[in-house]
Each structure stands twice: as structure tokens, then as C-alpha cells.
């Protein structure tokens, strides 16, 4: 489907994909540096947000290193095991196969209950089959490790209610 790939590689979708790759790479670098705790992120065309307890300077240094390493060709950093893409792919596969297992059960409750173990088994099979698919979809669709022309603009810390810390990592494309 070359037209889909062409769409993904231009303008707004491409900027989101590149920032998504940098977000993942930053999380990998922070993990390598032993930053403990739960961190998460979300990307958009102007950068990404990091949720969790990390010092602003540490995050900045991690993002700088991540950008450098992606630019040097470490494209594997763009794929992250905890990405929501993996969850979405697994959920769709599990739900889709479980739904197929329940097809044709309209009517009696006893018929539905009899089919329930099959639906559960099909859901588990779907989830397991989808595990290698999530990272592949990250690599091909939701991230782009080509960071040429990208620069970090700033990292801003926001302390929100209940002691939650979020950071905005802003980027800019120069090409």
C-alpha cells in the first residue's frame, strides 16, 4: 500500500511519527541510565509529553542522547515494548477473534455460555499472535526513526495536581 506509506511520510503525520520515535528513544535512554519509576509519553507534531517523576535536566540530556543515537542509525530505539500500539494491536486481535468465537450465538443464553470457552481461547490466541505484530506496526506505521532535520527546542516541567509531574519536550523540523 504505497499510498498509505506516502501519506505517512509527509507533513503532519510524519512529524508525529518522528516525535513518537524520539519519545521512545528517550524512554530507552532513561531506562539505560537507571531512571526508576513508571514513565510514559504521548507524541504530537510539535514534540512529546513525558509523564512521571524524572528531573528536567535528566530528561533533556536523555532526549539529546536519544536524538543523537537515532541520527547515528540506532533505529531500534524507535520501537518500545510498552507502546500503546502494542496494546491496541493485541486488543484488536484478541477482541476480533473472541467475537468470531461468539458468532452465531444469538438467542438462548445456554448457547452463549457453551461457546464462551471457545471465545476466550480464541481471544488468547489472537493476543499471542499479535505480540510480534505490535512492534512491526510501530516500526512501519507509528514511528519514523529518520530524525534528520529535527532539533530539540526546549523541555518544560509542569507540576500538576496530586504531585504528578509532566514534561513537554518541544521539537522543530529544520528541513
Per-segment meaning from a language model:
Residues 74-101:
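Transmembrane alpha-helical segments and their cytosolic interface motifs
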Residues 19, 23, 52, 79:
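A structural signal for conserved, well-ordered secondary-structure elements
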Residues 104-114:
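Membrane-interfacial hairpin junctions
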Residues 42-69:
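Short, charged cytosolic
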Residues 1-47:
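N-terminal, intrinsically disordered, low-complexity segments
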Amino acid at each position: 500500500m504505497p499510498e498509505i506509506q506516502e501519506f505517512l511520510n509527509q507533513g503532519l503525520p510524519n512529524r508525529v511519527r518522528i516525535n513518537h520515535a524520539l519519545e521512545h528513544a528517550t524512554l530507552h535512554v532513561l531506562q539505560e541510565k537507571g531512571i526508576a519509576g513508571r514513565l510514559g509519553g504521548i507524541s504530537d507534531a510539535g514534540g512529546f509529553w513525558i509523564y512521571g517523576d524524572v528531573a528536567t535536566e535528566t530528561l533533556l540530556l536523555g532526549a539529546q542522547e536519544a536524538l543523537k543515537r537515532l541520527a547515528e542509525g540506532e533505529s531500534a530505539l524507535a520501537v518500545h515494548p510498552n507502546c500503546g500500539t502494542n496494546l491496541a494491536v493485541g486488543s484488536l486481535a484478541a477482541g476480533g477473534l473472541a467475537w468470531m468465537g461468539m458468532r452465531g450465538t444469538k438467542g438462548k443464553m445456554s448457547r452463549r455460555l457453551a461457546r464462551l470457552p471457545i471465545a476466550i481461547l480464541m481471544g488468547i490466541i489472537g493476543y499471542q499472535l499479535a505480540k510480534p505484530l505490535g512492534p512491526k506496526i510501530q516500526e512501519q506505521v507509528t514511528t519514523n526513526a529518520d530524525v534528520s532535520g529535527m532539533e530539540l527546542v526546549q523541555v518544560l516541567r509542569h507540576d500538576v495536581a496530586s504531585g504528578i509531574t509532566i514534561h513537554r519536550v518541544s521539537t522543530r523540523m529544520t528541513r
